[in-house]
């Protein structure tokens, strides 16, 4: 959308929704001798049913403005924007054994060995960015970029990262002394650039937090096994962006 002469803006929003329900059932099948109906060994010791429910929500929003102006042999292009993306994922698992009937395809049909577990995770990335382009007579080109990112994967004190870049180019093929070569060399450019990028991906979504989980693998207390919590990963609150 063009708001003023040379100035345009856009807003984009996208979402991805995923809901998956998976069921699996194993029935106990008894084999018999055809002539005598004498039971033989069954194909499995018990019947079972399991169910998994997966729900995922991903969203992304982008707000961006562009301004371009040409005066004489000079062209200036400015760009600034903001973006954010976030994702939430939930998973639930449940299973039962010894079904009262093979025709009941629901968890409540199981009478033994109730197992349940679930997990949830989420992440977000917020970014601001800008760019300046300068062009003189389509011969001398300059570009500067800067972006600032905030990632939920890092401790609040270390979530931000600055990533600048700059480049300059000379289209020597546009110079008058290259005029005779334009029939076979119409675009020759020398370019020099320097920049940095950030990498936020680590072995987990929360490397700065020490996570815990329930366990029964501990020494018995009073002759019986006791449930407890244990730390299953080391934390590093100082971990931050990898600069490339």
Could you say what each language-model-derived stretch is?
Residues 1-26, 39-244:
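Extracellular/periplasmic, surface-exposed regions of secreted and cell-surface proteins
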Residues 28-30:
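Short amphipathic helix-turn modules centered on a small-residue break
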